[in-house]
C-alpha cells in the first residue's frame, strides 16, 4: 500500500512452561498450613530462564514447578516504583521449605 517492506531476523526466543500436576497437588495440600491458598494455575509466560530450566527438568523425567506468591501490586516489575508486601515472605518461605521436605519423603 505504501511501498514499505520489512525483514525480520530472529535473534532470540522464549518458551513457556507448565507446573507439573504432582507439584500443584502438593502445593494445594500444603498451602493452607502455611496460611496461603492456591489460585487456579496458568501457563507461565514470563521468566524465560526459569521456563528453560523447567522444560529441561521435565524432558528428563523430573517434576518442575514455578510458584508466584501474591505480594501486592506496588508498581510494575523492574521499575523504580516496584515494591512488595514483605508480609508474604515468611509464609512463602514456609511453603517452599514444606514442599521440599514433602518431596524428600514421598
Predicted regions span which residues?
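Metal-dependent amide/peptide-bond hydrolase catalytic core
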Residues: 1-106
Amino acid at each position: 500500500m505504501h511501498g514499505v517492506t520489512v525483514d525480520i531476523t530472529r535473534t532470540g526466543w522464549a518458551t513457556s512452561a507448565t507446573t507439573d500436576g504432582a507439584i500443584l497437588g502438593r502445593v494445594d495440600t500444603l498451602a493452607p498450613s502455611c496460611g496461603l491458598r492456591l489460585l487456579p494455575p496458568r501457563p507461565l509466560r514470563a521468566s524465560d530462564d526459569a521456563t528453560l530450566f523447567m522444560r529441561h527438568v521435565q524432558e528428563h523425567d523430573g517434576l518442575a514447578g514455578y510458584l508466584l506468591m501474591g505480594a501486592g501490586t506496588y508498581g510494575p516489575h523492574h521499575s523504580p516504583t516496584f515494591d512488595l508486601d514483605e508480609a508474604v515472605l515468611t509464609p512463602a518461605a514456609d511453603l517452599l521449605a514444606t514442599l521440599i521436605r514433602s518431596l524428600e519423603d514421598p
